[in-house]
């Protein structure tokens, strides 16, 4: 899972993720927005879940983060499509709406994001 942190001309941090993990970048850009308290909450949940069978989720405005002891899933809240909503012959492209990754990989991105934010 490759990632890149950038600052736009206004100083806002933007996250770009490799193909297949784009939604993780969208989660940082839309939900985190430099809110380190949210990252604290996610890291605390990851520690609490380690070695357990429990799961945890944090629903945001645009994206929901779900986690268990091994895996993190980020999905767009609008992903709740039923088959009737799609025109015949059309497929919904969800690569930028759903992503799965390991907890350790996700926490590495969280730590790198936190470090980048604090480098001002």
Swiss-Prot record:
InterPro entries: UPF0231. Pfam families: UPF0231. It comes from the Bacteria. HAMAP family: UPF0231. Belongs to the UPF0231 family. This is UPF0231 protein CKO_03249. It comes from Citrobacter koseri (strain ATCC BAA-895 / CDC 4225-83 / SGSC4696).
């Amino acid at each position: 899972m490759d990632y890149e942190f950038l600052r736009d001309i206004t100083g806002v941090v933007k996250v770009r993720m490799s193909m297949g993990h784009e939604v993780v970048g969208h989660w940082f850009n839309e939900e985190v927005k430099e809110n380190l308290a949210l990252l604290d909450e996610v890291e605390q949940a990851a520690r609490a879940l380690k070695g357990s069978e429990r799961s945890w989720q944090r629903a945001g405005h645009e994206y929901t983060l779900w986690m268990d002891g091994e895996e993190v899933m980020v999905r767009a809240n609008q992903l709740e499509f039923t088959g009737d909503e799609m025109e015949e012959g059309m497929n919904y492209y969800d690569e930028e709406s759903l992503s799965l990754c390991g907890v350790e990989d996700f926490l590495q991105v969280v730590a790198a994001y936190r470090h980048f934010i604090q480098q001002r």
